[in-house]
C-alpha cells in the first residue's frame, strides 16, 4: 500500500529535519537559518523579515530547553507557526498577521 498524501507530508518534514541535523539529531543555529532560507523564502519574504535578526529571534523562541539546538519537537513547533500563518492567509488574513511568530 502506498502512503497517503498526509503520510508523505509528514515523511517529507522528517526528511527535511534530518537534512539539517547533526549526529545528535538536532539542528544548530546556522543550519536552522539555512533551512529557513532554503525552504521558506516566500514565507520570509512575505513577512518582510528576511534579516538574520528575525531568524535569530525565531531560534531563541523555539529553543525551549536553551541547549542552543533545535530538537524535533521544537522544529515541529516552528513548522506549526508557519503552517498557522498560511492557514490564516487561506481565510483572508495578511501574511504574518499574528500568532507565535
UniProtKB/Swiss-Prot annotation:
Chief location: cytoplasm
Pfam families in UniProt: S_100
Residue sites binding Ca(2+) per the record: 63, 65, 67, 69, 74
Residue ranges annotated for the EF-hand domain, each copy included: 13-48, 50-85
InterPro entries in the record: EF-hand-dom_pair (IPR011992), EF_Hand_1_Ca_BS (IPR018247), EF_hand_dom (IPR002048), S-100_dom (IPR034325), S100/CaBP7/8-like_CS (IPR001751), S100_Ca-bd_sub (IPR013787)
Cysteines paired by S-S bonds: 47-96
Membrane keyword on record: no
Similarity annotation: Belongs to the S-100 family.
Protein name: Protein S100-A7
Amino acid at each position: 500500500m502506498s502512503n497517503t498524501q498526509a503520510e508523505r507530508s509528514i515523511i517529507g518534514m522528517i526528511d527535511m529535519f534530518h537534512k539539517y541535523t547533526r549526529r545528535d539529531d538536532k539542528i544548530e543555529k546556522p543550519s536552522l537559518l539555512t533551512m529557513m532560507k532554503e525552504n521558506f523564502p516566500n514565507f520570509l519574504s512575505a513577512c518582510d523579515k528576511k534579516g538574520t535578526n528575525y531568524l535569530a529571534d525565531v531560534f531563541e523562541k523555539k529553543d525551549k530547553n536553551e541547549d542552543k539546538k533545535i530538537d524535533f519537537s521544537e522544529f515541529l513547533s516552528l513548522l506549526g507557526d508557519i503552517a498557522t500563518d498560511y492557514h490564516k492567509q487561506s481565510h483572508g488574513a495578511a501574511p504574518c498577521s499574528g500568532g507565535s511568530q
